[in-house]
């Protein structure tokens, strides 16, 4: 054990070990060491820092053990956990195992008192101590059924006390460890799988846990634990000698560990405590400490790109080495009975395996391997020996594989194979072969965006998009997306869809419009790979316009014929519409886990159907037949109402009060629902409030029928916000005789519809109380969430040109926050602006909302009114 007092750098004043321990002196020592350690972080090697810290605490604990007169007691103190590995970070737990021998009652009481004083002193120093007091027998008995205790025993390290007791323990650890290699391996593998599931089995979390996320420090430790148990060694270096890993793999794993150690050390310093979650709060400060600069978002994105690249390497090494251990060391591989599928490859135990070690000397075999996987559906993965060869070959490449004509032919073969974008594409992504093939893909590996919208790096998002496209034709995912499945089944150029998916975000992070830059990349790729001009045009168009359908469906009024007409003009052909619809669905579903819902699905499908109807007309300039849709809705609603027992005359009398816009914007089921309740309602019982799911969108529909009194929206928005309901869509329609029919589509904060009867009644009652002015509109002032506080979005108001003379449309972009819509409604009310419709879209931390408004005279806003409204919104919404 090194003597920290003699360290040439740390000159802290150590308390005299011959005196009684003084809390004040030790606190001063700890403060001095913490300051020295933080200062050293800037220039010191991280390996030196974490080991130096462990050595420092070795001496501190050993000295206190002596000062509390425990040296001559039948007890010894051991470091376990990370401390047992001789590594400590500023906020790490200091895990201790105190071994005691069997003693008589009097001696045991005396020892217990001393140990209590010792541990209490450590706590009084505010150290994060984790400790247990056990006999040798207890240690092994408890470890039999607890893999965590068993792992701690493997990593135990002697600090001080009765050496004979420790030697007895260590001998039993070597000879009578209760877990066999096979059982220990399986238990640690199960433990890792469960841990990964807590993080959705992906390394690409916005706020990753440096220690426990997939690809984190725990994955490196798992590799070491399994090998150390099997080979009965404490040294990582010995694992190369035992043939568990190559020297290069050992160096790579150590480099990755040091990088993760450095970011964890910085995180602990930034947080001022143990914190392994790289939260948004800490990311800018950690980036500064690691030397990425103080450029805020840009510095964070660069740091996180490096982080994601490291954890990708760790994940690959972890899986390869654990598979190798299972196959080669536990003896489960059976290459003798492999099925030869080519001169270079075979299938053994459902894994692709190389038939000779120089298989990848021909670098085209890198791509050919994945073609083999597509051609042989029995293959479920790649053998660890072959992964090792692949990794070595990948490292030897001097240029992208796409520069080789034979590789290009093989890649085309793969993309056009019915199973090519399934398992093969997934494995190419996981083993960084896509980055070896396309130089543009290399640039997006680990590329993240510092926001709450994009849950994955660009490469991971793109992989998930392509996987979604593939699943539209995969029998295992049948009936999940019927329209997409139908359209993909009819496509004779499905490979164009996959290529568009690969290139849709390929230019992110370069600056400029990524859609335009990606379009050029896609076109060049198609020309380089020998695709026809027709194919190149389709792929390039899809990449250029991959956001168009999503923006139109979510941020425009798709019940406005002008909007549908403009979108149809952009798309121009039914074929483009089919491809774009499938690409859009796959894209949204691959962005984050909570983005896709029935509401978005319905918006996209409605836009698809309306546009498809237009594009299938024979006219060169197709138009939407509004009158036909109105008549169809009326006829269907009439049939529903007649079957419910209403008279045709009373139905027509009611409908005579409604405008044509009402029948165009609502389904027959909605019209029937509204009409039934209005016809049954005594006039003195206004307002009529209906809450249900008649829209079948997986959302809740709120319908209010009331006397027209202006700015009803502001009151309703305040109530809905106080009830923790998000407005997705609002339609404000007036009857011909002074009534309003307001329809709101809402979801609860957790994204679920409102279904509980008591909640529905609560919302309805509060609305009645507010509309009857029995209570004021609830306040919408609530603090921002922890996550939202780390983001800023400049408020922008953009007026959108429209041919409608009686209305004005504007888009609002601002930071999403509690009560935003209610606040905007209040601003409109103050400015005497009447809301006609609203479309609410939340993009992570950013609100991108569309509002259609008019004046009290039912005219469009003048330029002066627009200027005043814009200034008021920006002033009131800015922080």
UniProtKB/Swiss-Prot annotation:
HAMAP family for the chain: PII_uridylyl_transf (MF_00277)
Record-linked InterPro entries: ACT-like_dom_sf (IPR045865), ACT_dom (IPR002912), HD/PDEase_dom (IPR003607), HD_domain (IPR006674), NT_sf (IPR043519), PII_UdlTrfase/GS_AdlTrfase (IPR013546), Polymerase_NTP_transf_dom (IPR002934), UTase/UR (IPR010043)
Residue span(s) of domain HD: 458-580
Cofactor(s) this protein cannot do without: Mg(2+)
Gene3D superfamilies the record matches: Hypothetical protein af1432
GO molecular function, one term: [protein-PII] uridylyltransferase activity
Positions of the UniProt region annotated as Uridylyltransferase: 1-340
Listed Pfam families: GlnD_UR_UTase, HD, NTP_transf_2
Protein name: Bifunctional uridylyltransferase/uridylyl-removing enzyme
Organism phylogeny: Bacteria, Pseudomonadati, Pseudomonadota, Gammaproteobacteria, Alteromonadales
């Amino acid at each position: 054990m090194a003597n920290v007092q003699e360290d040439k750098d740390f000159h802290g004043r150590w308390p005299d070990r011959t005196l009684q321990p003084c809390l004040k002196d030790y606190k001063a020592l700890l403060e001095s060491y913490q300051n020295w350690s933080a200062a050293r972080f800037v220039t010191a090697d991280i390996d030196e820092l974490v080991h130096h810290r462990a050595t420092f605490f070795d001496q501190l604990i050993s000295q206190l053990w002596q000062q509390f007169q425990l040296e001559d007691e039948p007890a010894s103190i051991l470091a376990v956990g990370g401390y047992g590995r001789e590594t400590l970070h500023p906020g790490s737990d200091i895990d201790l195992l105190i071994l005691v021998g069997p003693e008589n009652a009097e001696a045991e009481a005396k020892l217990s008192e001393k140990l209590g004083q010792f541990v209490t002193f450590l706590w009084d120093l505010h150290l994060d101590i984790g400790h247990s007091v056990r006999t040798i027998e207890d240690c092994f008995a408890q470890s039999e059924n607890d893999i965590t205790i068993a792992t701690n025993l493997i990593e135990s390290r002697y600090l001080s006390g009765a050496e004979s007791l420790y030697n007895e323990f260590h001998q039993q650890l070597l000879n009578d460890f209760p877990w066999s290699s096979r059982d220990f391996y399986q238990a640690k593998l199960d433990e890792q799988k469960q841990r990964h599931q807590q993080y959705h089995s992906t390394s690409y979390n916005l706020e990753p846990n440096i220690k426990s996320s997939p690809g984190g420090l725990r994955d490196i430790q798992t590799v070491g634990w399994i090998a150390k148990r099997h080979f009965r060694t404490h040294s990582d270096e010995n694992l190369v000698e035992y043939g568990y890993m190559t020297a290069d793999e050992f160096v790579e794993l150590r480099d990755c560990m040091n990088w993760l150690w450095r970011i964890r050390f910085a995180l602990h310093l930034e947080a001022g405590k143990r914190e392994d979650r790289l939260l948004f709060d800490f990311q800018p400060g950690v980036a500064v400490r690691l030397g990425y600069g103080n450029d805020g978002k840009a510095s964070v994105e660069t740091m996180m790109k490096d982080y994601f690249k490291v954890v990708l390497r760790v994940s690959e090494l972890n899986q390869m080495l654990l598979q190798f251990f299972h196959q080669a060391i536990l003896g489960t591989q059976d290459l003798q009975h492999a099925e030869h599928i080519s001169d270079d490859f075979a299938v053994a135990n459902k894994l692709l395996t190389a038939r000779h070690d120089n298989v990848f000397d021909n670098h085209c075999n890198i791509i050919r391997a994945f073609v083999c996987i597509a051609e042989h559906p029995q293959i479920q993965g790649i053998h660890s020996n072959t992964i090792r060869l692949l990794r070595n070959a990948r490292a030897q490449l001097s240029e992208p594989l796409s520069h080789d004509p034979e590789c290009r032919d093989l890649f085309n073969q793969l993309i056009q194979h019915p199973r090519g974008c399934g398992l093969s594409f997934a494995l190419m992504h996981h083993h960084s072969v896509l980055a070896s093939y396309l130089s543009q893909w290399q640039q997006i590996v680990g590329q993240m965006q510092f926001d709450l919208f994009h849950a994955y790096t660009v490469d991971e998002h793109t992989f998930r998009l392509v996987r979604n496209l593939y699943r539209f034709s995969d029998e295992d995912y049948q009936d999940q997306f019927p329209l997409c499945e139908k359209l993909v089944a009819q496509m004779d150029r499905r490979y164009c869809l996959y290529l568009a998916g690969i290139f849709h975000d390929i230019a992110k992070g370069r600056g400029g419009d990524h859609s335009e830059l990606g379009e050029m990349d896609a076109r060049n790729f198609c020309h380089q790979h020998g695709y026809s001009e027709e194919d190149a045009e389709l792929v390039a168009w899809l990449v250029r316009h991959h956001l168009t359908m999503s923006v139109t469906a979510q941020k425009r009024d798709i019940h406005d014929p002008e909007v549908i007409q403009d979108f149809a003009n952009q798309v121009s052909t039914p074929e483009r519409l089919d491809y774009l619809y499938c690409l859009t669905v796959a894209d949204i579903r691959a962005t984050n886990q909570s983005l896709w819902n029935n509401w978005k699905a319905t918006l996209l499908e409605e836009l698809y159907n309306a546009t498809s109807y237009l594009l299938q007309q024979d006219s060169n300039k197709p138009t939407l037949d509004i009158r036909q849709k109105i008549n169809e809705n009326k006829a269907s609603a009439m049939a529903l109402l007649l079957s419910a027992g209403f008279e045709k005359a009373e139905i027509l009398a009611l409908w005579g009060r409604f405008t044509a816009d009402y029948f165009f914007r609502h389904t027959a089921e909605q019209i029937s629902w509204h009409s039934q309740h209005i016809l049954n309602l005594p006039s003195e019982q206004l307002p009529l409030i209906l809450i249900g799911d008649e829209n079948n969108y997986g959302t809740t529909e709120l319908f209010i029928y009331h006397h027209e009194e202006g700015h009803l929206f502001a009151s309703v928005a305040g109530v809905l916000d106080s009830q923790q309901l998000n407005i997705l869509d609002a339609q404000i329609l007036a009857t011909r005789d002074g009534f309003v029919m307001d329809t709101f589509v809402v979801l609860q904060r957790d994204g679920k519809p409102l279904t509980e009867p008591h909640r529905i009644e609560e919302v309805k009652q509060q609305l009645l109380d507010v509309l009857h002015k029995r209570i004021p509109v609830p306040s919408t002032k609530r603090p921002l969430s922890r996550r939202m506080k780390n983001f800023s979005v400049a408020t922008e108001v953009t007026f959108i040109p429209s041919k409608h003379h009686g209305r004005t449309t504007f888009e609002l972009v601002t930071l999403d926050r509690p009560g935003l819509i209610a606040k905007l409604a209040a601003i409109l009310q103050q400015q005497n602006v009447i809301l006609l419709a609203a479309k609410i879209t939340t993009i992570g931390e950013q609100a991108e909302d569309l509002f259609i408004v008019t004046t009290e005279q039912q005219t469009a806003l003048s330029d002066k009114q627009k200027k005043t409204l814009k200034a008021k919104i920006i002033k009131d919404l800015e922080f």
